Amino acid sequence: MTETSVISPEVTQLLEDKNLAFVATLMKDNSPQITPTWIDLVDGIIIVNTAEGRVKQRNVSRDPRVAISIVDNKNPYNMVTIRGKVIEQTTHDADKHADKMAKKYLGVDKYPFGMPGEKRILLKILPLKIFHMTPRS
């Protein structure tokens, strides 16, 4: 297992493959809240697409610290845990990004789960600590 703040090629692959990420945030009472979600990586920043007002978005507005766990869906012994903080929340291109994630995870061109009046928001996460466990050969 290695610990670093640099995203290695192996961790990049985990983030770019069709693996679900489990994103943990802190509730108002400091209890953990965890959500399985789609994930993206752009220029060293991890991006989570959510809807404005959802629990994880409210939580990171109050406390930007997050933990992310990803397990390779092809090999459960290839895994990464990332601690970081949300450095930006933006609605800019969030709908377009949801479509990009739908293409990656579902193979469809348009995000199919949007609700009427829903406002998509991107959570941009700066990785601070990365723990990667590689499978043994």
Question: Where do the language-model regions lie?
Answer:
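Extreme N-terminal tail/first-helix region
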Residues: 1-20
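Charged, gly/pro-rich active-site loop segments
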Residues: 2-6, 78-137
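Hydrophobic alpha-helical segments typical of transmembrane helices
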Residues: 7-10, 22, 56, 97
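Solvent-exposed residues in well-ordered beta-strands and their adjoining turns
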Residues: 42, 51, 71, 87-89, ...
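Short beta-strand segments
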Residues: 19-52, 66-70, 80
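A short beta-turn/loop motif at secondary-structure boundaries
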Residues: 29-31, 72-76, 115-117
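Short, surface-exposed beta-strand-loop junctions and turns on beta-sheet-rich folds
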Residues: 54-56, 75
